[in-house]
UniProtKB/Swiss-Prot annotation:
Heme b b562 binds at residues 83, 182. Heme b b566 binds at residues 97, 196. Its main location: mitochondrion. Disulfide bonds: none annotated. This is Cytochrome b. Keywords: Electron transport, Heme, Iron, Membrane, Metal-binding, Mitochondrion, Mitochondrion inner membrane, Respiratory chain, Transmembrane, Transmembrane helix, Transport, Ubiquinone. It is found in: Mitochondrion inner membrane. Component of the ubiquinol-cytochrome c reductase complex (complex III or cytochrome b-c1 complex) that is part of the mitochondrial respiratory chain. The b-c1 complex mediates electron transfer from ubiquinol to cytochrome c. Contributes to the generation of a proton gradient across the mitochondrial membrane that is then used for ATP synthesis. It comes from Microcebus lehilahytsara (Goodman's mouse lemur).
Amino acid sequence: MTNIRKTHPLMKIMNSSFIDLPAPSNISSWWNFGSLLGACLAIQIITGLFLAMHYTADTATAFSSVTHICRDVNQGWIIRYLHANGASMFFLCLFLHVGRGMYYGSFTLSETWNIGIILLFTVMATAFMGYVLPWGQMSFWGATVITNLLSAIPYIGTDLVEWIWGGFSVDKATLTRFFAFHFILPFIISALVLVHLLFLHETGSNNPLGTPSESDKIPFHPYYTIKDLLGLMFLLLTLTILVLFSPDLLGDPDNYMPANPLSTPPHIKPEWYFLFAYAILRSIPNKLGGVLALIMSILILAIIPILQTAKQRSMIFRPLSQIMFWILTADLFTLTWIGGQPVEHPFVTIGQVASILYFSLILIIMPTVSLMENKMLKW
């Protein structure tokens, strides 16, 4: 008798995606982050649903409804902090997932890579709108500053900003629509994840060597399900420690003050996962230039496949490219640090140098180094 998982219309899809899927035999723990991101998304949707049951999207009561969740709702505090810190874990896994794709040359799977970039933008939009919802000082001023950037668009900028606000400033209408979008976007993300997986399973996964895997594949279950479970345990352990011991470690103290349009916080800054892009935005004195640089800091990922000049797919046997990759990583850490610092000397100059280095590495230095390596290998 044929196994039901191979004949049932629904289970057949699950089986070919997660059980009998032929996977390369040598993929390392760096390939765990896809499943970890799926786990993060599930955690965010579940905790978010419970938070939405008690939250009110109204400027008069939003802040106190979040306080009510933490103080009066059974286990409300843990749900709230799981959601807030879950977002940080989500972005940590996202950055590592993208970094792995760059290091091992997974961007050559162009459809999967491009859907991944769309996913990154969507997750960033969702996180930004979620940060506005508690209606604290940083929520309000973050929303004001970031939405105001759209006014740099010629001709339609001002109208566009007022259209997003639903008035002449960030107010009740803005909060209501941000809550609506924040609720619906995770489900759109889930649909995009399925498309991402669909394209991935069309071509098959890359591996650390960057070589074709057709000759040596193993079933996904039990080998990689066990491996993914180990990664999931580490993720949950880290998240639990963060939530139970220092839930406010990654937050901003200013967000514990109710939003006040008449008082500007001394340093307006977003959550840590946006700081690198915020530093790039701030390092350009021109408003429109800054906005374009901000968008390009993420969109530049889309042209990485075009800039690939190396004859080898993976960086594993290309030491010069590895050095450039780790310089890029260090540069992103520098930008993240600068994004959280006040706008004064020497931080402005460091931010400008780091921003120039970021774009130079991806657009010029790394492709040139790859060409040099080709010459050295006589390819």
